[in-house]
Design a protein with these regions (language model features):
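Iron-sulfur cluster-binding electron-transfer modules in prokaryotic oxidoreductases
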Residues: 1-257
């Protein structure tokens, strides 16, 4: 860390902002418990990944430039999403091959951008959390977090410190859920088959709750589980680690009361 209390900017992500703000609050709570000074830059916008994956490099570049400008001056940038963090860390610099100034700025941003749980364990050295959840969970490894950022052991390490919780592994935790951002729109039949297979694996564990670190995956799997009449609850891993499962109903369910 660069100082006793690193200054961390939270990249909220579009899906957290629009569908699950509790995840953002959970991320702030965890980061503050880890000793960070947390700020949420108000001018932040989409990371540009949907445009990038669709081949729209012009709009992806424009969005990336906005993000680069909004997140200057922080020690670290942290996102509760391996997908968005991976976009910034691995794809931004190449967007500015024709712009040396922004190429340098984007490389600097990429070097200090992290997925939330891996930042907590690998950068600030968090060993355990002060949370409790009675029951069993299973964990889905989101593609970008796993393959671009190496996020696998980190969430399991912290989940194993949650009192009352047991973690049951999927038979194939690394298999894609079929979301893939715009993939599920471009190839809906393939996406449905993939998420159906994934949900079969989830239900076979007997776990009461499904966790993951990316809202896109969670929304996709929650929707399929609900259509199949499953009672499995679906949550972002940050909500469990922060002890905030009472603050919002499971994904896809209405809050009672």
């Amino acid at each position: 860390m660069t100082q006793a209390r690193p200054r961390v900017a939270l990249f909220v992500t579009c899906l957290v902002d629009l569908y699950r703000p509790t995840v953002g609050f959970a991320a702030i709570k965890l980061l503050e418990e880890a000793g960070c000074l947390v700020e949420v830059p108000p001018s932040q916008t989409c990371c540009g990944q949907p445009a990038y994956n669709s081949g729209d490099r012009a709009n992806a570049k424009a969005l990336a430039r906005s993000v680069v400008d909004a997140f200057q001056g922080y020690d670290y940038v942290v996102a509760p999403s391996g997908s968005c963090a991976g976009m910034i860390a691995h794809h931004y610099p190449a967007l500015f091959d024709d712009d040396p100034h922004y190429r340098g700025k984007s490389e600097a941003l990429a070097a200090r951008t992290h997925e939330l749980v891996s930042f907590l364990t690998d950068v600030v050295g968090m060993e355990k959390v002060a949370a409790r959840l009675d029951g069993s969970v299973t964990y889905h490894d989101s593609c970008s977090g796993l393959r671009e950022l190496g996020v696998k052991a980190q969430p399991r390490k912290l989940l194993n410190s949650v009192e009352g919780l047991s973690v049951i592994e999927l038979a194939e935790p690394e298999i894609c859920c079929g979301f893939g951002g715009t993939f599920c729109v471009k190839y809906p039949d393939i996406s449905v088959r993939m998420v159906t297979d994934k949900c079969r694996d989830i239900q076979a564990t007997g776990a009461g709750t499904l966790l993951a670190g990316d809202m896109g995956c969670l929304l996709n799997m929650a929707g399929r589980l609900k259509r199949e009449g499953s009672s499995i609850k679906v949550r972002h891993v940050a909500e469990v680690l922060a002890g905030m499962t009472q603050d919002a109903a499971p994904i896809g369910e209405a809050k009672k009361g």
